[in-house]
Amino acid sequence: MRTSKKLPIVIAIISALLPASVFAQENINISQEQLEKLISQAVDKALAERDAKTTVQQSKADPITVEHKSVATPAVAPSPDMTIPYGFKFSAYARYGAHYQAGDEKYVSVDGSYNGSSGIGRLGNQGYGGEYSLIKTFKGENGAIWDANVMIEHWSDELNLKKAYVGVTNLFESQPNSYLWAGRDFHQRPSQEINDYMWMNHDGQGAGIKNFNINGILFDVGAVGSVESCDPKVVKAGDNPSRITCTGGSDTGDKGNYAVTSKIHGMKLGILDVAAYANYGFDSKAIDSDERKHAWQGALVLSHTTDHSMNQLISRYSDNSDNSVYNKTNGLHSTYISFDGMYTFNPHAMVRYLVAYQDYDNSKNPEDSRKNYAAIVRPMYYWNDIHSTWLEAGWQQVRYDEGGTNKGWKLTLSQNISFAMGPDFRPMLRFYVTGGQVDNQHTALITDTEDTRLDSLNVGAMWEVWF
């Protein structure tokens, strides 16, 4: 009954909007479904005609600027961001917390270690700080993709400008993936996770190119200078009310120590991935002539990755230097060999591990010559995608060529709350206890002391994040 009352009105609307052929039949029998469909079509047509009329009216009202280009206000140029995301990107790595010392050492550390306290294991055994970056990416009309980077670091009582560089990729048609950069950057700092060791480090300012492709082999080449550090001094009262020349952080110029660095990667040797490094260090005339030195180093890295494991073997030799050709020592020959990796038993259980050897041979100062041996293992169990328990055990021994051995062990139990399941997911809250013992016999011999043993017990709560 309600449908029959509405029918004349509907027919009137439809007859005004639809062609007459629709009603060619003498009898009209319309079901509820057909009726709703016709109403929908009619409404859509009416709205379309209304929009068309509105557009015509607006076009008549708007001033025509096509014929007056010479006097029209130019439109704002389109952003070069074009099809890539872009605005500013904020990224960071940081760790902060409380670390309570209840024993002899705040951080378990063997004297003469190749990497300080982290040489015996970093979990629950390292200081706090962070690195904070702002990155802006652009895409030019020619297709080149640019990025401008700035990083501030906080690892002491001051802030330092650690990165300030610009890079570009997709610049050369023949080398779309090559990356050309210039400025101040974290440069050539390959590292290991479980001992937090940068077995090469050439942070500085200069220029270079990465991923230059020659027949499938990738080349990285750079020329960089060590950044000058400011030496804080108290000066006479004058224009400087603080009477301090600087805070002791990074300066803006070069120090006078330079490095030419190179890396070849993207190579395969059977199932192994191969990477090779070669670096040369030298000094400018900013360094006194009797202090100028040369140094070089080379390294080979063999790595292999499967569905359940990641492993790498690192071999590095340095002449007149250790892990950086910036810092040169006449007569020093340093060899570093290490094997590290991770094995995943199942999504809930995995283990990281490392063994390392360093031969620090100083022919000009033989009493400083020593050999480092270290082993670290960290089994990890994930109860679910939030909670996990880690146990890290570390051992280290430093044998001096002349007189005595320093040695130690460390054990850390850590209960974690993390962003997701897995060793590389952050943010993470960590609650840990670390115990250990160090026996510095060599140190006691050269300092003429009797008490060589240091016992440690430390408790901490911290957070760690990277993104």
Language-model segments: which ranges?
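Gram-negative bacterial Sec-dependent N-terminal signal peptides
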Residues: 1-26
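Beta-barrel outer-membrane channel/assembly domains of diderm bacteria
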Residues: 25-175, 180, 212, 342, ...
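Transmembrane beta-strands of outer-membrane beta-barrel proteins
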Residues: 86-94, 144-150, 178-180, 217-221, ...
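Transmembrane beta-strands of outer-membrane beta-barrel pores
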Residues: 96-102, 152-156, 184-188, 223-229, ...
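Surface-exposed coil loops of outer-membrane beta-barrel proteins
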Residues: 97-122, 162-165, 172-270, 275-287, ...
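Outer-membrane beta-barrel domain signature
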Residues: 119-123, 153-157, 193-198, 247-253, ...
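Transmembrane beta-barrel domains of outer membrane proteins
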Residues: 133-137, 167-169, 208-212, 220, ...
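Detector for outer-membrane/organellar transmembrane beta-barrel domains
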Residues: 257-400, 407-411
